[in-house]
């Protein structure tokens, strides 16, 4: 069965989810809802990408139809998601990627239009969160609206899981050095309660809050209350990096930790989600990398055998978007 997908919102994640879907023969995007672009502009935005480069296939506007690699994708232009008739084009699994409808109630309106399941491409206020390689096996088919968590949680959770299963995590702090996102400002401007967030993304390293570390406790209950963290937003268009500093229950040399992470990256269970490198890499080396988390063996350090700093990279756009597709395909099989 080819999973029939609809995408609500054709922004950064929406467009990259479409790109990711084209690399997975188990799914096909049948429809996109985008009320703020006409088809010609959608073609342009999909064809040219300042970060990931020009789309290597074909994308056309043919008589008002959005056509990618010869396949027509129906375009809706509904501002109210409750009015999208997904069933009219056979789209059953919906990606909610507007960033606006983050609760079970708000994202659940897609079900009125014929959707069977909805995956929110962001942390949700109340929907169950799943991270591939971590807790997807706990998914229950009764859950119609779920969340793919955040890009940072997708990087951190697999790393934390493997370390905890092998050495035990007593407690830890995470910092993500995070690329800029669309919510930030190019020049200084007003920003409500978070004044620092209103400063220019192009000129500053901006400390910010993140719920990514605490969210690990939701997908890995054994670590609930043991992790917290923060973010530094940096002037970088894509690719972020997690710095996880943990106190271990079981003594381990850094070489032993490296061996465990390398083995995980080569295992059938984790190799799609976890990468491993001993190269002298920098952030641009990971643009387009579809792993959730790439362990940097040469970047981490140990103070002693119980206290270590671990470093793992992630393409916060392409890696995350690929996981959205993986989650959709996974739940379709469970259903």
Curated annotation (Swiss-Prot):
D-glyceraldehyde 3-phosphate binds at residues 150-152, 181, 210-211, 233. GO terms for biological process: gluconeogenesis; glycolytic process. Keywords: Cytoplasm, Glycolysis, NAD, Oxidoreductase. The keyword Ion transport does not apply. The active site is at residue 151. It catalyses: D-glyceraldehyde 3-phosphate + phosphate + NAD(+) = (2R)-3-phospho-glyceroyl phosphate + NADH + H(+). It is found in: Cytoplasm. PROSITE patterns: GAPDH (PS00071). One of its GO terms (molecular function) is NADP binding. Its EC number is 1.2.1.12. The record marks 178 as: Activates thiol group during catalysis. It is an enzyme of class 1 (oxidoreductase). Pfam families: Gp_dh_C (PF02800), Gp_dh_N (PF00044). NAD(+) binds at residues 12-13, 34, 79, 316. GO terms for cellular component: cytoplasm; cytosol; extracellular matrix; phagocytic vesicle. InterPro entries: GlycerAld/Erythrose_P_DH (IPR020831), GlycerAld_3-P_DH_AS (IPR020830), GlycerAld_3-P_DH_cat (IPR020829), GlycerAld_3-P_DH_NAD(P)-bd (IPR020828), Glyceraldehyde-3-P_DH_1 (IPR006424), NAD(P)-bd_dom_sf (IPR036291). Pathway: Carbohydrate degradation; glycolysis; pyruvate from D-glyceraldehyde 3-phosphate: step 1/5. Homotetramer. Belongs to the glyceraldehyde-3-phosphate dehydrogenase family. This is Glyceraldehyde-3-phosphate dehydrogenase. It comes from Dictyostelium discoideum. The lineage of its organism: Eukaryota, Amoebozoa, Evosea, Eumycetozoa, Dictyostelia. The gene is gpdA.
């Amino acid at each position: 069965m080819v999973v029939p997908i609809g995408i609500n919102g054709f922004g950064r994640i929406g467009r990259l989810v479409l790109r990711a879907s084209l690399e997975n023969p188990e799914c096909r995007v049948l429809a996109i809802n985008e009320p703020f672009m006409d088809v010609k502009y959608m073609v342009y935005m999909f064809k040219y990408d300042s970060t990931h480069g020009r789309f290597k296939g074909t994308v056309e506007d043919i008589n008002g139809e959005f056509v990618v690699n010869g396949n027509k994708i129906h375009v809706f232009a509904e501002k109210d998601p409750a009015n999208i008739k997904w069933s009219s084009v056979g789209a059953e699994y919906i990606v909610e990627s507007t960033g606006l409808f983050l609760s079970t109630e708000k994202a659940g309106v897609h079900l009125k239009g014929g959707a069977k399941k909805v995956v929110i491409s962001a942390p949700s206020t109340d929907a169950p969160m799943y991270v591939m390689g971590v807790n997807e096996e706990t998914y229950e088919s009764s859950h119609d609206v779920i969340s793919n968590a955040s890009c940072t949680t997708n990087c951190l959770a697999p790393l934390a899981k493997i370390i905890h299963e092998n050495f035990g995590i007593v407690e830890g702090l995470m910092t993500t050095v995070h690329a800029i996102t669309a919510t930030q400002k190019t020049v200084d401007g007003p920003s409500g309660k978070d004044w620092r967030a209103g400063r220019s993304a192009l000129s500053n390293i901006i400390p910010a809050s993140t719920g990514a570390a605490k969210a690990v406790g939701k997908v890995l209950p054994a670590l609930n209350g043991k992790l917290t963290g923060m973010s530094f937003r940096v002037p970088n268009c894509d690719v972020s990096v997690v710095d996880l500093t943990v106190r271990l229950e079981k003594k381990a040399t850094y070489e032993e930790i490296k061996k465990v992470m390398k083995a995980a990256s080569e295992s059938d269970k984790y190799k799609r989600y976890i990468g491993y490198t001993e190269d002298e890499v920098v952030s641009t080396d990971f643009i387009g990398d579809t792993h959730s988390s790439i362990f940097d063996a040469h970047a981490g350090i140990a103070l002693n055998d119980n206290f270590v700093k671990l470093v793992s990279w992630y393409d916060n756009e392409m890696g995350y978007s690929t996981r959205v597709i993986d989650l959709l395909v996974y739940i379709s099989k469970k259903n």
